[in-house]
Amino acid sequence: MNLSNLKPAEGSTKTRKRIGRGPGSGLGGTSTRGHKGAKSRSGYSKKIGFEGGQMPLQRRVPKFGFKNINRVEYKAINLETIQKLAEAKNLTKVGMNDFIEAGFISSNQLVKVLGNGSLTTKLDVEANAFSKSAVAAIEAVGGNAVKL
């Protein structure tokens, strides 16, 4: 047995359909395209989303609203979370790097500090945005809310 005399197993391969090679081939004439109509012509392709004349899905479903390209999304972090982080790492100043190291945000996200929970230690908090209640709670303990 050599590479030169290997053959596929009996019945494992089929001969290719050679379309449009005369009536004797069995696939001549209309060449499997039927008679007339757009689908029989060269260059035909139906439009994307075309459903045979039925109203297509993208026109049946109502269209509401849009995505504002100028929207700024913030990751919300509450005061109770900041308090736990400060206690765990014994911090007096909490900033973006601390949030990234703790896994609260990724490096390209913006942070908004919200006022849920309470602070018991004096902290300087750096973030991109603060709610009014968060600023009030931070300053009530003697800390600073630094907007980046």
From Swiss-Prot:
SUPFAM superfamilies to which the protein is assigned, alphabetical: Ribosomal proteins L15p and L18e
GO annotations of cellular component type: cytosolic large ribosomal subunit
Keyword vocabulary terms for this entry: Ribonucleoprotein, Ribosomal protein, RNA-binding, rRNA-binding
Annotated stretches, region: Disordered: 1-51
InterPro entries: Ribosomal_uL15 (IPR030878), Ribosomal_uL15/eL18 (IPR021131), Ribosomal_uL15/eL18_sf (IPR036227), Ribosomal_uL15_bac-type (IPR005749), Ribosomal_uL15_CS (IPR001196)
GO MF, one example: structural constituent of ribosome
Pfam families noted in UniProt: Ribosomal_L27A
Ranges annotated as biased composition (Gly residues): 21-31
GO-annotated biological processes: translation
Functional note: Binds to the 23S rRNA.
UniProt subunit comment: Part of the 50S ribosomal subunit.
PANTHER family in the cross-refs: 50S RIBOSOMAL PROTEIN L15 (PTHR12934), LARGE RIBOSOMAL SUBUNIT PROTEIN UL15M (PTHR12934:SF11)
Similarity section: Belongs to the universal ribosomal protein uL15 family.
Protein name per the record: Large ribosomal subunit protein uL15
Organism the protein comes from: Phocaeicola vulgatus (strain ATCC 8482 / DSM 1447 / JCM 5826 / CCUG 4940 / NBRC 14291 / NCTC 11154) (Bacteroides vulgatus)
Lineage, highest ranks first: Bacteria, Pseudomonadati, Bacteroidota, Bacteroidia, Bacteroidales
Gene from which this protein is expressed: rplO
